[in-house]
């Protein structure tokens, strides 16, 4: 019973120790300064510390409960052993009172029972010593729990001191987030500005490309006009040479006539013949020196007017001259008034132009009929304006695209045209400025093609 009382005293001590630990934990948590501005991370840390404290208490109770159960079981076994020893003593006394007939057998049995009880008692004593050691160990554990509580209190104090530093770090983090947000907005503004600059640069490049293409067209048109002016200059030089030749022939004829007149004047004799008819009145010459007055002669009668001669025979008709070259195409006239809506009928296609090798009649390699033979067109300076003329001559509304490098396959026969400068207003390709028919500097690998709009 004394042991049981000591055990209950130890249990009360452990309960009081646990209550003191709880009170210390509560007091430590109460010592923490209330700060409504603490962020969620600090609250979560406090919650985690509370959970760790509760787990520590549960661990202490889990260790103490088995120790208490072991002590109670040992005490119950001790009481049962005392009862069994008393019953054995009573049985031995009763057996001695009944008789001593079978003393030897009873003595042997009694000794065996006593030896068994002695061995059991030794085991129980050993077990009690072990339980005492466990109790000593439990006291060490209590001391360890007290030290851990003290350490936990120190940790809570350190946490209370760390709260303002954590708040300062939180404020710094808030400032950093604000600066990051401002940097993000500035980066977005820069991105939008760069995108606008990119769009403007693309627009400027497109405008520059369009202007360059227009300048190329103007240069091409100027080069075509220069070539036409050179051709006109050549024609004028040839005409001037012909006129000079004609003038030389006329001057030679005049010289011959003058020489004939001079020869006839030389052959005139000095014998005075009958007076001829009066000549026409000449121009008034310069006033000469007055000579001596001569003897006045008789006045002759006036002559009669002669008859008009007969008309001579007409000369033979001359040979026809060479046909001149086609003149330069004039500038387009003013735009006419809008005509009435037609019936939608397709224009009659040209009989001198065709498209070969395409997937339909609206596209293919351009071939032209000249001198009864079909030929191709070289793709040098082959542009949309020439394709527009070809498509309109075939009865289509316009041109979709032009093709080079024998896109629809190589043709056969002659290559009639090269570098066809068209204005786009001609009704057929024959009306464009064609320099010459028949090209030798181009091959069928450069045959031109076109795709018309349906």
Curated annotation (Swiss-Prot):
The modification Phosphoserine is found at residue 27. Residues 1-50 are cytoplasmic. Keywords: Coiled coil, Collagen, Disulfide bond, Endocytosis, Glycoprotein, LDL, Membrane, Phosphoprotein, Receptor, Signal-anchor, Transmembrane, Transmembrane helix. Residues 199-256 form a coiled coil. Disulfide bonds join 378-442, 391-452, 422-432. Residues 74-109 are annotated as: Spacer. SMART domains: SR. GO terms for cellular component: collagen trimer; low-density lipoprotein particle; plasma membrane. Residues 1-22, 267-347 are annotated as: Disordered. The chain crosses the membrane at residues 51-73. Glycans are attached at residues 82, 102, 143, 184, 221, 249, 267. Residues 74-454 are extracellular. It is a single-pass type II membrane protein. Its main location: membrane. GO terms for biological process: receptor-mediated endocytosis; zymogen activation. Membrane glycoproteins implicated in the pathologic deposition of cholesterol in arterial walls during atherogenesis. Two types of receptor subunits exist. These receptors mediate the endocytosis of a diverse group of macromolecules, including modified low density lipoproteins (LDL). This is Macrophage scavenger receptor types I and II. The lineage of its organism: Eukaryota, Metazoa, Chordata, Craniata, Vertebrata. The gene is MSR1.
